[in-house]
Amino acid sequence: MDHKGFKAIDSLRKTRIIYPIIVGCGFILYMLYKEFDPSIFSNISFGWNSIFWLVIAILLMLMRDIGYVIRLKILSDGEISWLKSIKVVFLWEFASAITPSAIGGTSVAIIFVHKAGLNIGKSAAVVMATSLLDELYFIIFFPLLFIFVSPHLLFDVEKYSSNILLNSFYWFAVVGYCIKLIWVLLLGYGLFINPVGLRKTILFVFKLPFLRRWKKNAYNAGADIIFSSRALRKKPFIFWFKSFLATAVSWTSRYWVVNTLFLAFFIVHDHFIIFARQLVMWIMMLLSPTPGGSGFAEFIFKEFLFDFINTDPENMLSYAVGLAFLWRLISYYPYLIIGAIIFPRWLRDNFNKSTK
């Protein structure tokens, strides 16, 4: 592959794979050193119950990926095969894992979808629709939480102010939610009201250094972008219902992973509150400047969920640190590993031909 082709996917270079691993593992090691007491785990019996719930946690992550694959099939009108859809999902998650949470892998995902068989215009429309559905999940469910869970239960974490207006977690969530809401409004406007404006936005994105190789293609695909956006507007209600249902299954499965990790070691009663706090956690993680939320995610987990650990108060933080590491081990690091394996081959298959 020539230098120009490599530069186009420079955002996924090896150093960006290593960086989140160093940050995440470094923060975990720091927490282990400061707050972890391995002797307390001698009182935990690791038996078939633990194995069962850990297997369920892994299956829930698989369910999450299956939901994403089904959604991609729906949004692409079945033009992308099942195998290619699976590859795109894992490549997309890999890109998200090595970029800051606020950025995600959206820009590069357009290339992944395009190389799976769609034109650039339709690829952009599919990726934008995917982003819209993801954010819509948070926009809808976050306000609904307050119907079933009081703000006191959501944000009243020990060591932090019980006054919600003085609680830093509350303001993290509010700012994150406002950012998501603004993005959904802009994206919805572009997809369903002003596709020409969406086209201009996509062209601006393709001026980024690592996407500049496709700038000319993006200009030529202007008509495709407008056509695809109009096509999405004409989709029937059932199309969007199935797409959003797949989205909801994916995100909900991801959140239940933590519940199963708690069940593997403790007796848990407040499952819905744990689920609700995770949704809030992911909104707060939008503000993380680190790739994949590395470090910040572990910190939020430890601080935001430790009081649900059913053990002696003096041992809660030690258990929380261990669970935070196990959580990321199941829900984050596998995407780095899988992506690091399949990305080089994807690179060879899709770019070597253009250099011969």
Question: Where do the language-model regions lie?
Answer:
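Predominantly cytoplasmic-facing regulatory/coupling regions of multi-pass membrane proteins
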Residues: 1-90, 157-282, 311, 322-325, ...
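Interfacial segments of multi-pass membrane proteins
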Residues: 112-122, 277, 281, 299-319
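Transmembrane alpha-helix termini and helix-breaking/packing motifs in multi-pass membrane transporters
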Residues: 142-159, 340
